[in-house]
From Swiss-Prot:
GO cellular component, one term: cytoplasm
HAMAP family found in the cross-reference section: RdgC
Entry keyword set: Cytoplasm, DNA recombination
Organism from which the protein derives: Shewanella piezotolerans (strain WP3 / JCM 13877)
Gene behind the chain: rdgC
Source organism superkingdom: Bacteria
A family per Pfam: RdgC
Cytoplasm found in the keyword field: yes
One GO process term, biological-process aspect: DNA recombination
Annotated compartments: Cytoplasm, Nucleoid
Designated name of the protein: Recombination-associated protein RdgC
Family membership: Belongs to the RdgC family.
Amino acid sequence: MWFKNLTVYRFNKPFSVDTESMEKSLEDFTFSPCSSQDISKFGFSNAFGKHGDTLVHTAADRHLICATKEEKILPAQVIKEALEEKVALLESEDGRKLAKKEKDALKDEITTTLLPRAFSRRSQIRALILPEIQMILVDSSSAAKSEELMALLRKAIGTLPIIPMSFKTPIETQLTEWLKESKTPAPFEMQDEAELKSDSDEGGIVRFKQQDLSENEVLAHIEVGKQVHKLALHFGQSVAFLLQSDAAIKRLKFSEEFRAGNDDLGNEDPMARLDADFALMGSELIALVNAVVEALGGLEDSI
């Protein structure tokens, strides 16, 4: 349940959530497994998985949702080889070359035949809807997967006035200044990882890991025009993460001390523990995002 990445959206129109109404809206788009002829299926599932029984889990006007995706694993090479074999056989029998339309029809036929025997894989993606800061935080490092979830949510509830989080000042400009000065705004602390990139195609990319970023070797790249596009940071004593110039927050890692904040509850009641951890995580993520927005100079005005 602890988020590992953040793709952040903000509402560009005031948005509130009625939990009961949202629950009913999501019920029409619940996940169901692939049938023999389905390539993939995507739908909402219980927010707390096997420990929950609602699609929306709400606490303190913070709303957790989850979607499950099942995909059939049908390697393109398998289809290609089967198609080539079938085409060769038919062309030999008919004594002519098959047209593209005929090959496309054969490909569809082969796919239909192979689908029932294909293995499948499942994945889940969660999002935190936060009316109090007018944002949605998606636990994904993939912009495409985040957009897929937002599209499903929009389809379910009818409207979702959101835009990706963006800032008044380019993020790479701020990150470069922090690295150049070896100083970050409180409560952030710079760690030992960064990626610098040149604006020109010829300039290249340089990555540093487990290295003191204040060393001249690192700063020399800024002097020749490279900018910082990824920077590892720590938020107070609670969360380590990688901030990127596209506003993605990746590799979230909550400290053991922070995660132990609810250890006094034990694990005898899984639902109670999940609910407590959800509250703990939600509050810290809100604090983190608000601090990032302030440190980077504020959000870009919405259109």
